[in-house]
């Protein structure tokens, strides 16, 4: 869960001004994919609670006045939600079912499930706060792609380390958005002022939440996988043209030296990020479907995440 992102604007550095002293305006997109994501997560949670039907399976339900939507006991689920068995049936991340039964769809469905009301509210508030801003700046195609693909990356890494636990939650995709914000700052470094403050603030937010990921029962591997997936995708999808190039498109005077759309550093970062992403994504899938575990090669990595039967991201 991401609990601190809504307190600050981590990318608060403003765009540098042009020669006229005015900030170069970015196209403002209407945000609609992130609101749909939030609504979809809420609807899925309601469906899961309906299917869970606690009163017909247990006498220790909370908020019994809700009928079949009542919650499992605090002992069973302290986050006010369904049972682990219900989440597993509805598509939670489960290594055995993905590897042995080839239920690959779980790598995507798990990010739409939540362990409880508290889990859902924490994730969706942060997704809305971060995602709407990114979508307004870069559009629904790029932000939606980062959200889904980085969530998928988080699921892969989680499976490679957690073989005996189920995992649910949208935090892997949420960390993907944070990773994309960081790479966007780096690849468009020359277009921001106050960049030092912005990048330090963002790194502090990510660091604090990764630290919280070592507490039970959070799946920190999903956070890490989502963050690095979004970080690499941000270099590819959130690149801005140089301001000099944009200004030349507005008023190209005779004799003006035309600058390239992207500088050399931006192009190098794009190439390196694409190679690393393809290599990491492909190798992760290959290792997963071979039934292998990265714990065999990294003896200390288990310390990065709390390990239990159920994991919430």
UniProtKB/Swiss-Prot annotation:
The keyword Transcription regulation is annotated on this UniProt entry: no
Annotated compartments: Membrane
Cysteines paired by S-S bonds: none
GO biological process: proteolysis
Keywords noted in UniProt: Hydrolase, Membrane, Protease, Serine protease, Transmembrane, Transmembrane helix
GO-annotated molecular function: serine-type endopeptidase activity
Gene Ontology cellular component list: membrane
Entry's EC annotation: 3.4.21.105
Catalysed reactions, semicolon-separated: Cleaves type-1 transmembrane domains using a catalytic dyad composed of serine and histidine that are contributed by different transmembrane domains
Membrane-spanning parts: 31-51, 112-132, 143-163, 166-186, 196-216, 221-241, 269-289
Chain intervals with Polar residues compositional bias: 15-24
Topology with respect to the bilayer: Multi-pass membrane protein
Domain of life: Eukaryota
Region called Disordered, residue ranges: 1-24
Record has Protease as a keyword: yes
Acidic residues bias locations: 1-11
Active site, UniProt feature: 171, 223
Stored Pfam families: Rhomboid
Function: Probable rhomboid-type serine protease that catalyzes intramembrane proteolysis. May function in embryo development.
PANTHER family on file: RHOMBOID-LIKE PROTEIN 7, RHOMBOID-RELATED
Family to which the UniProt record says this protein belongs: Belongs to the peptidase S54 family.
Protein name in UniProt: RHOMBOID-like protein 7
Gene name per UniProt: RBL7
């Amino acid at each position: 869960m991401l609990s601190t992102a809504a307190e600050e604007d981590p990318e608060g550095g403003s765009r540098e001004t042009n020669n006229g002293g005015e900030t170069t305006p970015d196209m403002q997109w209407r945000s609609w994919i992130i609101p749909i994501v939030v609504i979809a997560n809420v609807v899925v949670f309601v469906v899961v609670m309906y299917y869970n039907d606690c009163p017909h399976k247990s006498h220790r339900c909370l908020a019994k006045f809700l009928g079949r939507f009542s919650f499992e006991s605090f002992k069973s689920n302290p986050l006010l939600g369904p049972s682990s068995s219900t989440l597993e049936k509805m598509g939670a991340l489960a290594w055995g079912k993905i590897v042995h039964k080839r239920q690959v769809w779980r790598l995507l469905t798990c990010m739409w499930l939540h362990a409880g009301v508290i889990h859902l509210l924490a994730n969706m508030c942060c997704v809305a706060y971060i995602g709407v801003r990114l979508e307004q700046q870069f559009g629904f195609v790029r932000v939606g792609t980062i959200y889904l693909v980085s969530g998928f990356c988080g699921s892969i890494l989680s499976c490679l380390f957690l073989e005996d636990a189920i995992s649910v939650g949208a935090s892997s995709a949420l960390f993907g958005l944070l990773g994309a914000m960081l790479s966007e700052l780096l690849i468009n470094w020359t277009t921001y002022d106050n960049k030092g403050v912005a990048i330090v603030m963002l790194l502090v937010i990510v660091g604090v939440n990764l630290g919280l990921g070592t507490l039970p029962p959070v799946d920190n591997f999903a956070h890490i996988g989502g963050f690095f997936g979004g970080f690499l995708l941000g270099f590819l999808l959130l690149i801005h043209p140089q301001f000099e190039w944009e200004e030349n498109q507005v008023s190209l005077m005779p004799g003006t030296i035309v600058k390239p759309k992207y500088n050399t550093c931006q192009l190098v970062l794009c190439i390196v990020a694409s190679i690393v992403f393809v290599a990491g994504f492909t190798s992760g899938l290959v290792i997963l479907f071979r039934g292998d575990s990265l714990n065999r090669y990294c003896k200390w990595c288990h310390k990065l995440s709390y390990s239990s039967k159920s994991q919430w991201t």
